C-alpha cells in the first residue's frame, strides 16, 4: 500500500468502513508532506446538483503548497452516488487524472464498470465483531417467533 504517487483506488469493504478508514488514515499520515488530502461523504452529498460542482471546484484548486504536486480525494460511501455523478467522475478520470487522484470507498459493488476499470480495486479485510453475551440467550425469537411474541404478550398482561 506504500505506492506513490497514489493510483486511483477502490476500497471495497462489504457493509462496513472500519478497515478502509484505517487504511486511509495510515496513508494520509505517511504521505501528508507530499500530497493534499480531502474527503467527502457521498451518503450526504450524492446528487448531481451538489456533488458535481463540488468535485469540479476541488479539481480546479491548486495544491496548498508549491512542492505538493498530487491531490487525493476520498469519496466515502461512493455506492450512493447517482448514475449522473458516476458518469461525471468517469469523465474526470479520463481527462484530469494526472494531478488529482480519486479513491472510492464502497460497501456494495455498484460503481460503473468504466470507473472500476480505471482504478485499482482492493477488497479490505472483513471486520468481525463477536458479541459478548452475558446471561441467558433466548433463541425462541429465531426458532419460533410466533411463540416468542405470544409469550411476550402474555407476560405483559400478568
Q: What do these predicted regions represent?
A:
Residues 1-158:
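P-loop/Walker A NTP-binding region and its immediately flanking N-terminal helices
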Amino acid at each position: 500500500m506504500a505506492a506513490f504517487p497514489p493510483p486511483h483506488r477502490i476500497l471495497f469493504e462489504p457493509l462496513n468502513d472500519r478497515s478502509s478508514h484505517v487504511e486511509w488514515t495510515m496513508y494520509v499520515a505517511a504521505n501528508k508532506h507530499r500530497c493534499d488530502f480531502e474527503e467527502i461523504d457521498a451518503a450526504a452529498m450524492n446528487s448531481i446538483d451538489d456533488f458535481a460542482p463540488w468535485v469540479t471546484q476541488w479539481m480546479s484548486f491548486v495544491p496548498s503548497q508549491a512542492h505538493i504536486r498530487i491531490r487525493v480525494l476520498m469519496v466515502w460511501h461512493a455506492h450512493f452516488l447517482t448514475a449522473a455523478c458516476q458518469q461525471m467522475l468517469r469523465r474526470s478520470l479520463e481527462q484530469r487524472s494526472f494531478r488529482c487522484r480519486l479513491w472510492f470507498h464502497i460497501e456494495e459493488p455498484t460503481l460503473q464498470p468504466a470507473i472500476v476499470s480505471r482504478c485499482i480495486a482492493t477488497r479490505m479485510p472483513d471486520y468481525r465483531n463477536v458479541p459478548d453475551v452475558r446471561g441467558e440467550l433466548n433463541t425462541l425469537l429465531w426458532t419460533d417467533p410466533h411463540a416468542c411474541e405470544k409469550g411476550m404478550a402474555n407476560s405483559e398482561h400478568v
